[in-house]
Amino acid sequence: MPALLMKKITLLIISDLHAGSTVGLCPPKFQLPDGGTYGLSHAQQWLYQNWNDLGQQAVKSAKGGKFYLISNGDLIDGKVKQSVQTVTDSMVAQREIATELLDPLVQKADKFFVIRGTEAHVGGIAQHEEGIGKDFGAEKSESGTYSHWQLLADFGGVLFDFAHHVGGGGRPWTSGGNAVRLAAETVMDYAGERIPQLVFRSHVHKYADSFTNVKQTRAIITPAWQLRTAYGYRIAARPADVGGVIVTIEAGRADVDVVLYKPERTAVWHEK
């Protein structure tokens, strides 16, 4: 077996931080552009606590090998049309929030990859994610940018396909169908070529997994780090899924660990 395949590689795949959102991930006591300090809500404290827990799990899993961090899109919330659920509309400040959250993990990572998210959040041609990637010295795309619309990567002999966008799966009765469909589409798209064994998408804030439904590939829709927005309450009764994915690659095989943290449902009102 080639020496490259003998090396252990651990990936931490995170997405949809939506830094700058009042229901997104944020470090405690963040200083706003005008000098004030933003204090976390109870829900954001819960998010931050679990974010640190996920990072600790990933770093522990990576001991004795390489550690790669992959951000699969929507690092910041941006200035979304008609939304008032932002800590600040300053894109500089939102990027600083994302940078502060990522920095401890990037410092421990051997490589950092930035996948481009939704332009409504991260700017035209994902300019803010490109900027964050450049600031951290993230791995470059074949065109020389510090972020990728799509990343096709061989890690330890396992072929991965990363991109941000995917559709469907928002209703309970269709949950998981988007992952199975994505896996099947991947097999057809790569017909006659090497087929990615693991495919990752994000965007919908609902975890889904094709598991073994499609023999040649497995598709995973990642959980997010933003709780339900006003828009989320309008389109779905259940909370967003929160968490990330840790993949350990050894001897050309990948072991997938999906780490989920369960948000509380809306509290039941009781007659007093």
Model-derived segments and spans:
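Beta-strand-turn-beta hairpins that frame and shape the catalytic cleft
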Residues: 3-12, 152-161, 214-217
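A structural motif corresponding to the C-terminal end of an alpha-helix
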Residues: 57-67, 100-113, 193-195, 250-252
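Active-site neighborhood of divalent metal-dependent phosphoester bond hydrolases
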Residues: 48, 76-144
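Residue-level marker for buried hydrophobic side chains located in beta-strands
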Residues: 11-13, 69-71, 114, 161, ...
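A short C-terminal boundary segment appended to hydrolase-like catalytic domains
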Residues: 251-272
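Active-site metal-binding loops of divalent metal-dependent hydrolases
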Residues: 14-18, 73-76, 117-120, 165-167, ...
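Conserved beta-sheet core of the metallophosphoesterase superfamily
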Residues: 159-161, 166-258
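N-terminal active-site segment of His-dependent metallophosphoesterases
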Residues: 1-93
